[in-house]
Structure formats: C-alpha cells, structure tokens
C-alpha cells in the first residue's frame, strides 16, 4: 500500500482516477492544482506524485521543480499526465525529473499498471 498524491484540474479525470484506484490498497489524495498538491506533499511525503501538466495556479512542471528543489522530497517519483505526447516532450519530462508519464485518455487499468510499476521501481532503489 502506498500514499499517492494526484494533482488534476479536470473533474472528469479526477473521477476516473477515483474509479481506477478504488480497487487498489493505495491511499489517494486528489488536488485540483499543483499548489494544493505541494502543500499536501510538504505536510506528509507520499510514495508517488501523479500530476497533470496544465493546471491553474501551479502546473505539473512547476510542481515537479518545487518538489525536486526540496532535499526532503526530491526522492519522490513523479508521473506526468498529459493530453498529448509530442516530439521532444519525453525529453522535457526528463528535464523536470519525471519517473514516468501517461497520456490522456487512459484506461483505469493502464493507470494502475503504470503506478504499480513506478512504486515497485522506487521501492527497489537502494
């Protein structure tokens, strides 16, 4: 079981996340922007952060940069959720410390599988 912070401004995607994660043992927190997500992350560090890129107040890249700038948090893997993956995007994701990404639309199973993959990889790191 892992604690996961999700940052997503689209209500429909938040509902999909809730449905997808309901069948798991993970504890999830949903936030509508990166600023709220960062506040939650600073209060209690999760095992994984899943964030949309384009959100009001603080987007995914700014959130990732803020997390990685904090020594107590910079070990937390971050997965970006994006509406499309264009040429060069994967490199940009890496520049902002992404452990992975998933493109919208995604299935609940694809989301769960990617999350499990990233949590397993993070737990196996020395």
Outline where the language-model segments fall.
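Conserved acidic carboxylate
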Residues: 8
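Charged docking surfaces used in two-component/phosphorelay signaling
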Residues: 15-23
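Short hydrophobic/Thr-rich beta-strand motif most characteristic of the beta2 strand and flanking loop
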Residues: 25-32, 40
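Active-site beta3 strand of CheY-like receiver
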Residues: 44-50
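Receiver (REC) domain active-site loop signature in two-component systems and cognate sites
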Residues: 55
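C-terminal output helix
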Residues: 106-116
């Amino acid at each position: 079981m892992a604690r996961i912070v999700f940052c997503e401004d689209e209500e429909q995607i938040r509902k999909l996340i809730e449905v997808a994660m309901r069948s798991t043992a993970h504890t999830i927190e949903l936030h509508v922007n990166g600023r709220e997500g960062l506040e939650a992350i600073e209060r209690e560090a999760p095992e994984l952060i899943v964030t949309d890129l384009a959100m009001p107040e603080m987007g995914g890249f700014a959130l990732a940069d803020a997390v990685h700038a904090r020594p107590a948090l910079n070990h937390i893997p971050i997965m970006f959720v994006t509406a499309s993956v264009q040429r060069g995007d994967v490199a940009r994701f890496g520049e902002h410390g992404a452990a992975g990404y998933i493109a919208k639309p995604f299935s609940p199973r694809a989301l769960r599988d990617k999350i499990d993959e990233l949590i397993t990889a993070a737990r196996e790191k020395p």
